[in-house]
A protein has these predicted regions:
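Amphipathic, small/basic residue-rich leader segments at the start of a protein or domain
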Residues: 1-104
C-alpha cells in the first residue's frame, strides 16, 4: 500500500483529480480504501486459488475453455463486489471511480 500511495500522490497526482467535478466525491483516502478492499479480496479470495488453479489448470476442448472449478465462485464474488464497474459512470451502474484507481485494482 505504501508504494501505491507514493505512486498516487507523487507520480499520478491523484489529489488533483478530486478537484475535477467528476471526482468531487473522491479523495485520496477513498482511493486508499478501495485499494485496501481490493487487496483483501485478492488475499482472501484470489490467492487461495493459486494451488488449485495450478493443479487443475485451464483446458480447451470442443465445448470451449474450462477453468478450474474454484474460479467460478471467485468470479461471482468479483462481479458481486462491483469490481468490473469501478470506473464506469454511475448513470450506467458504475461507481464513477477515477480510472487510475480502477487500473491499480
Amino acid at each position: 500500500m505504501k508504494d501505491l500511495r507514493f505512486v498516487l500522490q507523487r507520480l499520478v497526482d491523484a489529489p488533483a483529480l478530486t478537484q475535477l467535478p467528476r471526482y468531487a466525491d473522491y479523495s485520496l483516502e477513498v482511493g486508499e480504501e478501495i485499494l485496501s478492499a481490493a487487496g483483501r479480496f485478492a488475499a482472501d479470495v484470489l490467492d487461495p486459488l493459486n494451488a488449485p488453479g495450478d493443479r487443475e489448470g485451464a483446458r480447451i476442448g470442443a465445448s470451449g475453455v474450462t477453468l478450474p472449478s474454484a474460479f467460478h465462485a471467485a468470479y461471482e464474488q468479483f462481479i458481486a463486489g462491483g469490481w468490473p464497474q469501478l470506473a464506469a459512470d454511475a448513470d450506467i451502474g458504475g461507481q464513477g471511480a477515477p480510472l487510475v484507481i480502477a487500473t491499480a485494482v
